[in-house]
């Protein structure tokens, strides 16, 4: 009679081997740590702490002595540029006007040849 397997036994067969070996490794390492516990404690005391540099760029102060009138905020500059570029039409294009407008745009961009 042949042995019957579950799907998980076939697919995850290597996991069972790893888990038993990892248990042994953990047990082995924990026994060695008990023996070497004093050495690790001594080396931990000898090492110096890690020095983390401070970020001084967060503490910058703005120079407010200059005249504020000369400076224009960036969002105002962008708004002015957008107003210059955009042209509006009050009516919506429908039917034949829309197709003419579409064709003229396609000719200008090079997608349609005249």
Curated annotation (Swiss-Prot):
Positions of the UniProt region annotated as Disordered: 23-50
A Pfam family reported for this protein in Swiss-Prot or TrEMBL: Senescence_reg
Chief location of this protein within or outside the cell: cytoplasm
Basic and acidic residues compositional bias, start-end: 31-45
One GO location term (cellular component): cytoplasm
GO biological process, one term: response to bacterium
Keyword Cytoplasm listed: yes
Annotated localization: Cytoplasm
InterPro entries from the UniProt entry: Senescence_reg_S40
Induction: Slightly induced by dark, abscisic acid (ABA), salicylic acid (SA). Triggered by pathogen attack such as Pseudomonas syringae pv. Tomato DC3000.
Keywords: Cytoplasm
Coiled-coil regions listed in the entry: none
Recorded superkingdom: Eukaryota
Protein family: Belongs to the senescence regulator S40 family.
UniProt protein name: Protein S40-2
């Amino acid at each position: 009679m042949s042995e019957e397997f579950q799907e998980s036994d076939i697919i995850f067969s290597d996991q069972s081997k790893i888990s038993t070996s990892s248990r042994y490794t953990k047990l082995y390492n924990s026994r060695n740590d008990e023996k070497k516990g004093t050495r690790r404690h001594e080396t931990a005391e000898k090492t110096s702490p890690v020095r983390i540099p401070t970020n001084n760029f967060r503490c910058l102060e703005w120079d407010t002595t200059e005249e504020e009138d000369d400076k224009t905020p960036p969002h105002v500059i962008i708004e002015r540029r957008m107003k210059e570029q955009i042209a509006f039409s009050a009516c919506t294009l429908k039917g034949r006007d829309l197709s003419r407008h579409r064709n003229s745009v396609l000719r200008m961009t090079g997608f349609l040849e005249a």
